[in-house]
Amino acid sequence: MQNLDPQELEKFEKMAKSWWDPNGDFKPIHQLNPTRLQYIQQQANGLTEKKVLDVGCGGGILSEAMAKQGAIVTGIDMTVAPLEVARLHAKEQGLVIDYQQITVEEFLQKQTALYAEKFDVITCMEMLEHVPDPLSIIQSCRALLKPNGVLFFSTINRTFKAWALVVLGAEYILKMLPKGTHDYDKFIKPAELLHWTDQANLVCKNICGYHYNLLTGKFWLNQDVSANYMATFQHKSI
């Protein structure tokens, strides 16, 4: 059984055409992208010539940004239309990105069968809260990571503040996101993420919150993880 939620996939299929519109449904992701890219570069000590896997890449906003920094990027997702958009946009930008429609669990099986090289950097951003079994995603990512590689997750804390900001505020009041984009019950507390990553034999190297400034339209990072947050992991042996 594939680790996916058909209703979640349908949401993003419907929004595919607006993926690269900086003022469309994915405006918050476009605004967030410079901040998360900078975080990834800092934690990974740069991306030039590093082999990167972007899990849940969607229309390729982060994949392209990392490729432009010199990374060798593979993007995987289970949606159809967003991947088509991603391939077309990368071609228009003159970027070579390997986009595949496949789950990370299936990708791992394929890589294992081919004895393929593992990845220096793996990103799984804004995805764990959209799948039935986050632990399975985490374990597969860990298995695909090089011994000295760096793994990134971002998600949303299950708090009243997060609901007020991400669901009520962003979806219903400010209408920054389509209604129904997020399901509060699927939000993930940092303690839960750390428990799952510990089970997967990963250690957290850094965790921080990211926050939106309505006046500037930009995101910034701090230590407040009560709403949106992202974290860096490595193998426990590192």
Swiss-Prot record:
PANTHER family: METHYLTRANSFERASE (PTHR43464), UBIQUINONE BIOSYNTHESIS O-METHYLTRANSFERASE, MITOCHONDRIAL (PTHR43464:SF19). This is Ubiquinone biosynthesis O-methyltransferase. Signal peptide: none annotated. One of its GO terms (biological process) is methylation. One of its GO terms (molecular function) is polyprenyldihydroxybenzoate methyltransferase activity. It catalyses: a 3-demethylubiquinol + S-adenosyl-L-methionine = a ubiquinol + S-adenosyl-L-homocysteine + H(+); a 3-(all-trans-polyprenyl)benzene-1,2-diol + S-adenosyl-L-methionine = a 2-methoxy-6-(all-trans-polyprenyl)phenol + S-adenosyl-L-homocysteine + H(+). Its EC number is 2.1.1.222, 2.1.1.64. Pathway: Cofactor biosynthesis; ubiquinone biosynthesis. O-methyltransferase that catalyzes the 2 O-methylation steps in the ubiquinone biosynthetic pathway. InterPro entries: SAM-dependent_MTases_sf (IPR029063), UbiG_MeTrfase (IPR010233). HAMAP family: UbiG (MF_00472). It comes from Histophilus somni (strain 2336) (Haemophilus somnus). Keywords: Methyltransferase, S-adenosyl-L-methionine, Transferase, Ubiquinone biosynthesis. S-adenosyl-L-methionine binds at residues 36, 56, 77, 125. Belongs to the methyltransferase superfamily. UbiG/COQ3 family. The keyword S-adenosyl-L-methionine applies.
